[in-house]
A protein has these predicted regions:
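Short, membrane-exposed interhelical loops at transmembrane-helix boundaries
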Residues: 295-305, 342-353
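Feature representing long, continuous alpha-helical segments
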Residues: 239, 312, 316, 324, ...
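Transmembrane alpha-helix interface/packing and boundary motifs in multi-pass membrane proteins
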Residues: 319-323, 344-348, 359
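C-terminal membrane module of polytopic membrane proteins
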Residues: 336-344, 353-410
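Functional transmembrane or membrane-interface alpha-helices that line membrane-embedded catalytic
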Residues: 217-238, 340-351, 369-370, 377-378
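Transmembrane-helix exit/juxtamembrane "anchor" motif
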Residues: 60-62, 77, 333, 374-380
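Membrane-embedded alpha-helical bundles of polytopic integral membrane proteins
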Residues: 2-323, 404-410
Length: 410
């Protein structure tokens, strides 16, 4: 009796050792100094491009974030990509990208609506009002259709592989889409709330490198983290102290520029937008603070004048120094699991976009929570109330007007 022939393509395994490496020709390794110079040059190029985009305005900054999220999704999905299997699964990659598009559509529409409700924008274009009115329904319809399509795309012999890929897709969307749900709100509240947290994380990363190189394992021999053996306690502590100092002074410096501190007040897109002007938020105005007695004796002053944002900057520095690095450690765990040196080579000297953004994702989430809890006013603005009144019928508007008149008379 002939033995039954097994299928030619076995059910895929999740063992990372079975993930085939991409074939590439051996190339000569660049020297350490060449790699360092490439890294430095690209760092300054990225900083210059970032500042130029910020100067272009809020919409350009939002566009940058969407591009980065797209590149991040591509890199993370490619971590588990297996060309041999997916050649036999038509439309599978397309379905993954559809999930990404639907997630972006829902997230940005939801955060866009939340921003309008709490902003000072007095006029919202009818097209945007119509979009927000049906946004949730359209998002759910897209989700339902895509859910059905995903189930129909499952192919016998590849169930385990496909389910693993879908699970990884959901994790990826959680990292780069839902964790950054309110990045649009941060940008529209003022580019300060986008630039400052990003710069604090970059500062901490740089100082951790230099402090680790200068003082690493000279005072504390205990390994910092087995997941990242090159990290040292000296680098971690030194970066914390340096980041606190940096955040204190840099927050005061960029508070001078109204185009960074002013929120969006209209949705008119211009290729070259006009400079923003506004009444500064209270956190960007100087206040007098009493100095503790033991410090007052040293500086011979009982009060000092600071910007409230300089005091808030302390918590941004603490978070960027203690919590944000774990985003990098998590990314390192992914690379170790799948035997990768970098997520990609799109940025010479730096690797992939994820290699540079791993610590930024959770910091953006922190910025949103911190701003809404400690910075944003809980008193509704006039613009917020007017946006609600516009939605009322004529009779309801007359009732509101009469109620306001009675309040003023009393």
């Amino acid at each position: 009796m002939a033995l039954r022939k097994r299928r030619s393509v076995p059910d895929a395994s999740d063992n990372p050792k079975h993930v085939p490496a991409r074939a590439s020709l051996p190339a000569p390794r660049p020297s350490g100094s060449t790699k360092f110079m490439t890294r430095v040059v690209m760092s300054f190029a990225m900083i210059g491009g970032f500042v130029a985009i910020l100067y272009g305005g809020h919409m350009y900054a939002w566009g940058l974030v969407v591009v980065l999220q797209t590149l991040l999704f591509r890199e993370l999905v490619n971590v588990r990509y297996r060309a041999a299997a997916e050649k036999n699964i038509p439309w599978f990659r397309s379905v993954q990208w559809m999930w990404f598009v639907v997630a972006l559509f829902y997230n940005y529409g939801d955060s866009f609506g939340a921003f309008i409700e709490s902003s000072k924008i007095r006029f919202v274009p009818p097209a945007i009002v119509h979009y927000l009115r049906y946004h949730t329904w359209v998002s759910f319809t897209m989700y339902a259709l895509l859910f059905v399509m995903s189930v129909l795309s499952l192919k016998k012999g590849y169930y385990k592989y496909q389910m693993g890929q879908y699970t990884w897709t959901i994790v990826t969307l959680g990292l780069i889409v839902f964790q950054m749900k309110y990045v649009l709100t941060n940008i529209f509240n003022g580019l300060f709330w986008f630039l400052f947290p990003v710069s604090v994380v970059i500062c901490n990363d740089c100082f951790a490198f230099f402090c680790g190189k200068l003082f690493g394992r000279k005072f504390i021999k205990t390994p910092f983290l087995r997941l990242s053996p090159n990290k040292t306690w000296e680098g971690f502590i030194g970066a914390l102290l340096c980041t606190i100092v940096y955040a204190f002074f840099f927050s005061a410096f960029i508070s001078r520029f109204s185009w960074l501190t002013c929120p969006v007040e209209s949705f008119e897109f211009k290729l070259i937008p006009d400079p923003l002007t506004c009444t500064p938020h209270d956190v960007f105005l100087p206040h007098s603070y009493d100095v503790p007695v033991f410090i007052a004796r040293v500086i011979n002053r009982s009060q000092i004048q600071l910007l409230p944002i300089q005091l808030h900057s302390f918590w941004f520095a603490i978070f960027a120094s203690i919590i944000s690095p774990f985003g990098g450690f998590y990314a390192s765990a992914i690379k170790r699991t799948y035997h990768l040196k970098d997520f990609d080579s799109v940025i010479p000297g730096h690797g992939g976009v994820m290699d540079r953004m791993d610590c930024q994702l959770i910091t953006n989430c922190f910025t949103t929570v911190y701003f809404n809890t400690f910075i944003r006013s809980r008193i509704p603005s006039v613009a917020t109330i007017l946006n609600l009144v516009v939605k009322l019928t004529l009779e309801e508007k007359q009732d509101v007007l009469q109620a306001i008149q009675e309040m003023l008379q009393s």
